[in-house]
Amino acid sequence: IEFKAKLLAQYWDNFQTEISQHLPESYQSEIQELSNNLEKALNQLIYELQNPTLTLATTGTTSSGKSTLVNLLCGAEIVPVAVSEMSAGAVTIEYSTEKSLIIYETPGALWECGEWRGISDDKIYQRLYQAMISYIENRETQPNLACPQSTITYPFRLLKESQLQLPKATRVRILDLPGLAYVGDQGNANVIKQCREALCIVTYNSAETDSQKVKSLLQEVVQQVKDLGGSPARMLFALNRIDVFRADRSWPESENRFVEKAIRDIKNELTEQLKEYTEDIENLKVVKLSTWPALLSLQIQNQDDIYSADACKKARNHFYGLIEDILEDLPVVNTQKWTRHDKNRVAQALWQKSYGEEFQQNLREHINKHFPQLV
């Protein structure tokens, strides 16, 4: 493509030189303007070919753990997570060795806006939390209030450790899209337009058992796909919170039955409403995942002993069933007294049982397969 672009520039230059000799003076400025515009467009095309940007956009159904997925991709808890819907505004995370946060000035902003460099993970989390909670609490009484828009630069794990085989000079960014309740809010529509060529990871709440709510979730999936535009072929569906089935006496049969039914239902619902993508939907990639235990696995391996012990405590309290056999083998209950060997055993078990490795591998393959379209 780069060769053809340069060839086109050469052809146009020859054509311009030839035709200019036969046109009156009044046409010369118009021809020159066309030349300048073509040169700018070709330079931009060549620059983007040499410096491609890979965008991963995250979206999901209600209470699907989308924000935890973003934190998993980053390898740190920097995006606010809550039981209720927290993703009120779009957050762009660009890869950099330096950490920074920008919260942009938006119409009527009631939260602190500005730029912070060399900021800690905890401070990023707190500032985003304050901006989002302020917006959520005031949006009904102030309908013209624009949602918060922010950009983080961060050395996220996705690029550092997941062994993505990307061309040199490829820039990578993660786009954490607003929750379904805020998709239509002022400011978010422009961000969603950026996802037309992105690889979209759609999280689905596997823990929901109510049949009416499941039907509602399927409708949400269809709506998300429609809002994002583009082909479902570039979407990766994650059946999140899949660990709930491990409590069943009939596991793994119950998990397998759920996965088969969920894939069938998602494909049927999408095919019914997006008939033009029938072939892409048939080849849809759906993976199992439990984002929180996978994230805890990474946090446990952190070299900061206090941070690591806190992650161990959360794993013990919330995911006892995943690590029961290891916990029974440990000499002490107090997580602060666990040895590095103890912590590594717990981390490995969480990573395996959360399907963290399978998710990472599928994501890597999906990016490699669709890379030309994604950039």
Where on the chain are the PLM-derived regions?
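Charged, amphipathic alpha-helical linker segments immediately N-terminal to NTP-binding catalytic cores
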Residues: 1-33
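Long, non-membrane, amphipathic alpha-helices that form coiled-coils
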Residues: 27, 31-35, 366-375
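Globular "head" domains of long coiled-coil molecular machines
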Residues: 39-337, 348-370
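Flexible glycine/proline-enriched surface loops and loop-helix/loop-strand junctions
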Residues: 340-345
